[in-house]
């Protein structure tokens, strides 16, 4: 079996793939040998699953018929692309195009496979739980036992918050990763509680954002939410792409499965420093709000199958969703922009010569800011890697990385138009990290700088600079150095302004063995303070440490 086998592979094996014949027969065997239920009627009468057995048998009958038709057509169990076209011709779908008939048939398959996969999972978990003790510790109406969590003796109609709260609890713990079968059935039976009023409620909006900020298990949380129908109910646009095929040579997963893999890639990139992705690991842990990246990842392909440009459609729906969550207009617009532009970076890096200045100029006209560039780069990398593992390679990675680095350098060389909204948002994100006394010091400093300073410096950089200022608040000069990316050094200097200061600093850095490759030069509104940032690298094989460079600067 190939390394990316899944229920949502575009060419499934109708006997062995998850959610097909093997899964259903395994569940039947457990029910027969452990519960004495030796027929489908007996299983139905025993109410094994609270939401009814009819949907499960319908799913089984569909996949069984599909397998029979595939066997007749190809003498194999694998429903490959050629077989899909042939089988769909005989599936009473002649009133639509061949492409659409395949998509309709396969969407029905994926829905059926999901139903059988869930049935198999529930039966297996019921068997495991059969010998376990009752749930013990209670947390906010939620009970935990070993690695499972559940809701007991609670009417969800009066406690709707528990629907999301149970996923929040899983995200808090490394030990808890599963929901017990009774609670899964309870949530599925009450899925209609997630209605328009629920979706518009600020409490549940904040809960959803907290789920996205989970420290643990986020990928499995989102998949479980989808399995139980929670994600589709809360994001109706997501329901429309469940089982949606991508009928091309690039995608090997349905839209919903591809979406989960994008978020999983982001998650792994954040948690682990994978070989070759050191830069991306650093970037993803520095972006101000990880939930912005996750939401963009969830929505970037949700416009597919609706007719028209899926990026434009997704941009509108993601903007409305972010506003519904109560996110700021800056954050909502960034999410919408990411969805709208999510293809531009891969397109330019692979189709144009990025060594040409005009190519970089064209690209940064779309991006404009470093913060937007960081988010777009991370979304692009993880989107491509989740499309088809066999098509991702180091060459594509290097093209994207080169485009990112060249664009970042170019953006830093250009004057940035002042944006009061962006400046205000970044100030707020920085000040919230400090206490009242420190905040007052920083406010006085910020008030003496115009908006272009805050557009040029992203939230992470401003936070670092602010920490240096607070640490050295009684000194006339503030100097800080830190390693960034792979072999670069960022140097921040805040000092009393004077004539020729920039020239003096560049000469000092040059004598220290550092080559200046980028610089942000700012003076305060009253022209009394200089706040300069240099991006440098070691010249040749200079072994000077960053602390030595800082000492040299202080001696100027």
Show the residue positions of the predicted features.
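Alpha-helical phosphate/pyrophosphate-handling elements in metalloenzyme active cores
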Residues: 30-42, 252-293, 320
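Amphipathic, well-packed alpha-helical segments that form the structural scaffold of globular domains
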Residues: 25, 121, 226, 236-239, ...
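Single conserved hydrophobic/aromatic residue that forms the stacking wall/gate
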Residues: 545-556
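Segments forming glycine/polar-rich beta-alpha architectures that bind adenosine-containing cofactors
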Residues: 468-526, 535-538
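Divalent metal-dependent catalytic cores for phosphoryl transfer on phosphate-bearing substrates
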Residues: 44, 53-65, 254, 282-413
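Non-catalytic interface/linker regions that flank or bridge core catalytic/transmembrane domains
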Residues: 1-251
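Hard-cation-handling environments
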Residues: 418-434, 440-446
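Edge strands and adjacent loops of beta-rich recognition modules
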Residues: 445-485
């Amino acid at each position: 079996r190939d390394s990316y086998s899944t229920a949502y592979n575009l060419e499934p094996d109708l006997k062995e793939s998850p959610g097909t014949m093997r899964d259903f027969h395994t569940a039947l065997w457990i029910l027969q040998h452990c519960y004495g239920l030796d027929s489908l009627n007996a299983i139905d009468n025993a109410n094994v699953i609270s939401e009814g057995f009819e949907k499960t048998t319908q799913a089984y009958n569909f996949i069984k018929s599909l397998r029979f038709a595939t066997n007749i057509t190809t003498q194999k169990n694998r429903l490959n692309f050629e077989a899909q076209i042939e089988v769909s011709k005989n599936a009473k779908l002649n009133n639509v195009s061949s492409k659409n008939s395949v998509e309709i048939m396969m969407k029905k398959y994926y829905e059926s496979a999901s139903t059988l996969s869930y049935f198999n999972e529930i039966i297996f978990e019921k068997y495991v739980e059969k010998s376990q003790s009752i749930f013990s510790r209670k947390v906010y109406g939620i009970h935990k036992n070993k690695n499972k969590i559940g809701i007991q003796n609670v009417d969800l109609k009066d406690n709707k918050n528990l629907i999301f709260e149970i996923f929040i609890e899983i995200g808090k713990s490394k030990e808890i990763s599963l929901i017990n079968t009774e609670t899964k059935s309870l949530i599925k039976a009450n899925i209609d509680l997630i209605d328009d009023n629920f979706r518009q409620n600020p409490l549940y909006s904040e809960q959803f954002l907290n789920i996205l900020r989970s420290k643990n298990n986020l990928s499995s949380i989102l998949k479980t939410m989808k399995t139980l129908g929670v994600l589709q109910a809360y994001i109706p646009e997501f329901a429309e792409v469940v089982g949606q095929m991508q009928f091309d040579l690039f995608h090997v997963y349905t839209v919903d499965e591809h979406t989960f893999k994008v978020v999983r890639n982001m998650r792994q990139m954040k948690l682990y420093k994978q070989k070759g992705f050191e830069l991306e690991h650093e970037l993803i842990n520095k972006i101000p709000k990880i939930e912005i990246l996750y939401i963009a990842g969830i929505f970037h392909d949700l416009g597919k199958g609706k007719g028209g440009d899926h990026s434009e459609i997704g941009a509108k729906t993601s903007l409305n969703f972010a506003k519904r969550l109560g996110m700021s207009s800056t954050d909502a617009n960034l999410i919408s922009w990411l969805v709208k532009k999510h293809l531009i970076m891969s397109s330019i890096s692979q189709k144009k010569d990025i060594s040409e200045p005009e190519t970089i100029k064209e690209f940064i006209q779309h991006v404009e800011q470093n913060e937007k560039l960081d988010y777009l780069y991370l979304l692009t990398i993880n989107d491509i890697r989740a499309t088809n593992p066999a098509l991702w390679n180091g060459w594509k990675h290097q093209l994207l990385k080169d485009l990112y680095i060249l664009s970042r350098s170019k953006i830093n060389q250009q004057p940035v138009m002042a944006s009061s909204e962006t400046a205000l948002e970044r100030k707020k994100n920085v000040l919230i990290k400090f206490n009242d006394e420190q905040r007052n010091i920083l406010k006085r400093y910020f008030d003496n700088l115009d908006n272009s300073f805050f557009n040029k410096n992203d939230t992470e950089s401003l936070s670092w600079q602010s920490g240096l200022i607070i640490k050295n608040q009684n000194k006339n000069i503030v100097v800080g150095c830190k390693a960034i990316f792979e072999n670069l050094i960022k140097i921040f200097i805040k000092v009393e302004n004077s004539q020729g200061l920039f020239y003096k600093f560049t000469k000092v850095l040059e004598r220290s063995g550092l080559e200046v490759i980028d610089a942000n030069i700012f003076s305060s509104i009253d022209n009394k303070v200089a706040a300069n940032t240099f991006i440098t690298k070691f010249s040749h094989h200079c072994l000077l440490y960053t602390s030595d460079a800082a000492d040299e600067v202080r001696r100027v």
